[in-house]
Amino acid sequence: MASPEYQRFLQSVNIGYVEWHDGIGYDLEALKSLCPTERQQAEDLLLSRRSDFRDIEALDTLGTARALDGIEGLLSSRNLELRLHATRRLAARKRISSDKVESILLDTLPNVTPGKGLTEALSLAEAHPTEAVRRRLLYCAVKGNDDLRVHAAALAHFLYGGSTASFDWTHRPLYLRLGSRVRAERQAAYEELC
């Protein structure tokens, strides 16, 4: 029979609307307290899923070589949010190089949208602001998708020292001009940004 901790963990894996909406993770305290047999069962379950940031978070909590290899397998996922969450976790553990983080950011930044990696990409770019990443943010500020341009401009402005926060509200009017659908307006705002 499953322990109360394992039952709690399994219940937390079945997320509903509130957990999804609020980004509530699995019960990691219950996961940490499992006996070795149940930890293995939990790891098997998580490796079979790997479809949500919560799975990555729980695999990272387990921290076994097999769990971390499972996270590493997501570095080539078509799901940008999963790829970026995996990148963050593996970079924190020094399992991937700074060059690999940069490569993933350069590949994913132009394609992220809300709910599909935007927040994670910007957070990771802020934590790994190489020159190539900053240049890619500038590119996205002008040529990125409608949802990305404003945020890419704000973060680039900050990373190049032009503002005091990753989204400096005192510069919001400038950032919003980069959100225009009219390319000439974006170009004029870009020149002001730089």
Please describe what each predicted stretch is.
Residues 56, 72, 86-88, 119-122, ...:
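Hydrophobic core positions within HEAT/HEAT-like alpha-solenoid repeats
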